[in-house]
């Protein structure tokens, strides 16, 4: 896959899966051996995590603005401005996420290091694993 195609996959993940909390694209966007360095359980773990967030925190809203997408080889780095709201609390930050892709799918995902702390500011605690 070209770097432009890899960037398109990452953009779709951020804009659809994260912003819309939509797990229906996980099988299409993630490789079967997908590893997320924040959410345990691989692809199936992520598919369970998204609806868990929706049911546990019905007021939770994400708006992730992609500032830059930079690709080299099989890696894409995204500079993202995150805005989370939940139960009247808001948190905003800008950080980097890194993705490794193979055959048009995300194989590995290093979410921004401050994601868990940012979610905690709006009352959301991530599972450990």
Tell me what each language-model feature is:
Residues 1-129:
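C-terminal and inter-domain tail/linker signature
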């Amino acid at each position: 896959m070209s770097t432009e195609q890899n960037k398109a996959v990452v953009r779709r993940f951020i804009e659809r899966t994260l912003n819309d909390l939509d797990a229906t694209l996980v099988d299409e966007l993630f490789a079967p051996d997908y590893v997320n360095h924040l959410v345990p359980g691989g692809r199936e773990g992520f598919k369970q995590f998204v609806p868990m967030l929706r049911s546990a925190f019905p007021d939770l809203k994400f708006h992730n603005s992609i500032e830059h997408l930079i690709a080299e080889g099989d890696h894409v780095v995204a500079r993202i401005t995150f805005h989370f709201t939940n139960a009247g609390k808001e948190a905003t930050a800008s950080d980097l996420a890194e993705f490794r892709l193979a055959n048009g799918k995300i194989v590995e995902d290093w979410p921004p290091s401050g994601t868990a702390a940012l979610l905690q500011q709006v009352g959301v605690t991530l599972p450990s694993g």
